[in-house]
Amino acid sequence: LAGIRGKEIAMIFQNPGASLNPVFRVGDQLLEAMRLHLREPARSLRERVVEILGRVGIPSAATRARDYPHQFSGGMAQRVMIGIGISCVPSLLIADEPSTALDVTIQAQVLALLRSLARELGVAVLLVSHDLGIISQMCHRVLVMYAGRIVEEADVATIFRAPAHPYTRGLIDCLPRTEGSARLGTIAGVMPGLRSIPSGCPFHPRCPLAEPRCAEEEPKLRSAGDHHSAACLLVGT
């Protein structure tokens, strides 16, 4: 795994303040993975650090590389995290809620940066998010998870236009609408703990369409259309 982690697969965490080491300069933290995976002279790697910081939008990159994490704003710290993630040009970049702690304006800038860098470098991005707005903007294909299990998979347009799983429908119904005066949708009940997942379909205690068999039979992913599947006993019936 040591040869894969950071080189073939890299990760951006949701809280840069907790992910960056407060006692090391950001440039040294960028260097860490490159020293391990890239066979280049030290001087070349340090030049690459400055180049990466500039690429992710850090002004005065050569100077800021010598600064510590507490000297960066939340948005700039997240840009540093993106720089660390792309430093070895991985095949897969996992972004775990990369904009959670940011205000809306900075969030849009960081996501636009992530999208443009992924396209420019040819890196696949696995985005973990609970924000359907971000998912609609960033993703091509979506996997919906509930209680640790995949309950639906489809391209992003299908997920929003024709969701097949009741949980996915419930999530989309919770989105605020600009037209009309209908009450905001909610999903009844609470998410089960991973040590107390219900038998059968894990969503059945909260599902408005649940049948008796839903409490007994665990559904597997089944076809709900072209390149579309859902783990629901009612799909295809």
Predicted features by range, described:
Residues 1, 25-44, 54-59, 71, ...:
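ABC-type ATPase nucleotide-binding domains, specifically the catalytic core motifs of the NBD
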Residues 2, 94-98, 102-182:
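P-loop NTP-binding/switch modules centered on Walker-like glycine-rich loops
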Residues 1-10, 28, 36, 157-163, ...:
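ABC ATPase NBD coupling module
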Residues 67-72, 76:
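Conserved ABC ATPase signature
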Residues 59-65, 153-237:
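Short catalytic/signature loops enriched in Gly
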Residues 87-91:
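A short, proline-enriched helix->beta-strand linker immediately N-terminal to the Walker B motif
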